[in-house]
């Protein structure tokens, strides 16, 4: 190991994609894509291979120039060590400049090395199959390759890779908006022109009618003069046959005044010049339409907001009314259940009081009835009588009272459980 290799230290965390350096590289060749990029001094072809990191969604691309097969060492390092710091990348690029033969190209960014140096780096980075596939891939662009960019400096990353810019989408959106505005302006122009043409047609028709009336009046005047002049004027005014023929020939050659006026009117219909005030009208109509649309939108928004507020307030009032009604019903149910429970409890309390009184009375009567303790003689006991059978009266009465109290307690518990069940059953429908 040389001193340069000792001073070189690669990052510890590698891309898990590059595990086995002995894989077959032939399946990776179809994944390579060729692309032509336009530069100021001419087009250049690049071959790229997309290598994804299994631990992240950010892809990396290995790049190769088609003209000399040089490979981007920067893209190799970043793909092999995606979590490396900028200092580690700078140290590795410095080591490559000192120990390998980098190629300088001002058109692309990053550090590029020839194929032999790229294969040496691939061994260190454990990515030999990917570099072999990139070197063997064809440099002819496929039919589905991305289009070339107009400028190279803006469309390249620090790895020498063209960026996926969104300029195409923005330009398409701008074109669509321009087309829509142009269509709107054309429609407004058409409406205004139609209106103006209608007015001009009305004026032209009125002029035609006036000219026709003038022609008719001109025709009627000589007829009236002829009638007033009599036969003498008719004889004088009658032209000869030769004159009639000459006039007929001239009338055929030269158009009449009526024909000239109608032709002028038709020319005016065909060649109607656009007035310079049309642009002002178009602009004013467009501005009016935009202001009307904006006012309508604002009105609609205010109406929607007011309706939403009204609906929210109505829902809130209905919810409050419903909650108050439920609370009142629950209170009524609780009071009713409490009154129903209190009745059997009062009865039980009275029974307990009666039992206590009866127990006290029995105890007092037993105490009064029992004689004072006297020493009995042996003669009072029979010889064959069992001692255990001789139970005092006091003890038997107490046991009976205890058993009665026990059974009464059980009854009270049962009644309490029934009352609680009835109360819960009455409250649950109001809660759910």
Curated annotation (Swiss-Prot):
Q: Which GO terms describe its molecular function?
A: DNA binding; telomere-nuclear envelope anchor activity
Gene3D superfamilies named in the record: Apolipoprotein, Transcription regulator HTH, APSES-type DNA-binding domain
Kindly state a single biological-process term from the GO annotations of this entry.
meiotic telomere clustering
Its Gene Ontology cellular component terms are: cytoplasm; membrane; nuclear envelope; nuclear inner membrane; nuclear membrane complex Bqt3-Bqt4; nucleus
Q: Which residues form the HTH APSES-type domain?
A: 38-147
Record region (Disordered):
1-21, 139-283, 364-384
Q: Where is the protein situated, by its record's location annotation?
A: Cytoplasm; Nucleus; Nucleus inner membrane
Topology term for the membrane: Peripheral membrane protein
Q: Is the keyword Membrane assigned to this protein?
A: yes
Record's compositionally biased regions (Polar residues) = 229-241
* Keywords of the record: Cell cycle, Cell division, Chromosome partition, Cytoplasm, DNA-binding, Meiosis, Membrane, Nucleus
Per UniProt, the ranges with Low complexity bias are 139-152, 163-172
Q: Which residues bind DNA?
A: 73-94
* UniProt superkingdom: Eukaryota
Which stretches does UniProt call biased (Basic and acidic residues)? 180-228
The principal localisation class reads cytoplasm
Task: Describe the protein's quaternary organization and the partners it interacts with.
Answer: Interacts with rap1.
**Function comment:** Connects telomeres to the nuclear envelop (NE) during both vegetative growth and meiosis. This connection ensures clustering of telomeres to the spindle pole body (SPB) when cells enter meiotic prophase.
Provide the protein name.
Answer: Bouquet formation protein 4
Native source organism of the sequence: Schizosaccharomyces pombe (strain 972 / ATCC 24843)
């Amino acid at each position: 190991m040389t001193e340069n290799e000792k001073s070189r230290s690669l990052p510890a965390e590698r891309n898990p994609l590059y595990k086995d350096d002995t894989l077959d590289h032939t399946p990776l060749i179809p994944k390579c894509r060729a692309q032509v990029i336009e530069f100021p001094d001419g087009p250049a072809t690049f071959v790229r291979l997309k290598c994804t990191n299994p631990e992240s969604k950010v892809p990396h691309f290995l790049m190769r120039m088609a003209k000399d097969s040089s490979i981007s060492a920067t893209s190799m390092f970043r793909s092999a060590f995606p979590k490396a710091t900028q200092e580690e990348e700078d140290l590795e690029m410095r080591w490559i400049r000192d120990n390998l033969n980098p190629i300088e190209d001002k058109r692309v960014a990053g550090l590029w090395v020839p194929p032999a140096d790229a294969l040496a780096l691939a061994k260190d980075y454990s990515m030999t199959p990917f570099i072999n596939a990139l070197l063997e891939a064809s440099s002819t662009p496929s039919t589905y390759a991305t289009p070339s960019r107009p400028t190279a400096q803006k469309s390249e990353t620090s790895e020498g890779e063209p960026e996926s810019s969104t300029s195409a989408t923005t330009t398409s959106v701008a074109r669509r908006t321009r087309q829509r505005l142009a269509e709107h302006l054309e429609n407004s122009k058409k409406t205004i022109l139609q209106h103006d043409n209608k007015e001009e047609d009305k004026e032209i028709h009125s002029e035609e009618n006036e000219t026709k009336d003038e022609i008719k009046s001109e025709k009627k005047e000589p007829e009236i003069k002829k009638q007033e002049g009599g036969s003498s004027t008719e004889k004088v005014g009658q032209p000869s046959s030769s004159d009639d023929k000459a006039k007929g020939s001239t009338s055929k050659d030269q158009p009449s005044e009526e024909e000239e006026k109608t032709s002028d009117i038709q020319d005016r219909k065909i060649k109607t010049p656009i007035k310079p005030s049309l642009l002002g009208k178009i602009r004013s109509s467009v501005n009016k339409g935009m202001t009307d649309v904006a006012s309508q939108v604002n009105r609609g928004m205010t109406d929607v907001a007011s309706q939403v507020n009204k609906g929210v307030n109505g829902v809130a009032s209905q919810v409050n009314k419903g909650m108050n009604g439920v609370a009142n019903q629950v209170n009524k149910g609780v009071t009713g259940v409490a009154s129903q429970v209190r009745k059997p409890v009062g009865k039980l309390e009275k029974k307990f009081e009666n039992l206590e009184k009866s127990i006290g009375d029995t105890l007092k009567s037993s105490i009064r009835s029992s004689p004072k303790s006297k020493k009995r003689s042996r003669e009072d006991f029979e010889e064959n009588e069992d001692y255990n059978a001789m139970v005092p009266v006091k003890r038997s009465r107490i046991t009976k009272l205890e058993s009665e109290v026990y059974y009464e307690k059980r009854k009270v518990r049962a009644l309490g459980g029934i009352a609680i069940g009835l109360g819960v059953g009455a409250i649950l429908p109001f809660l759910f």
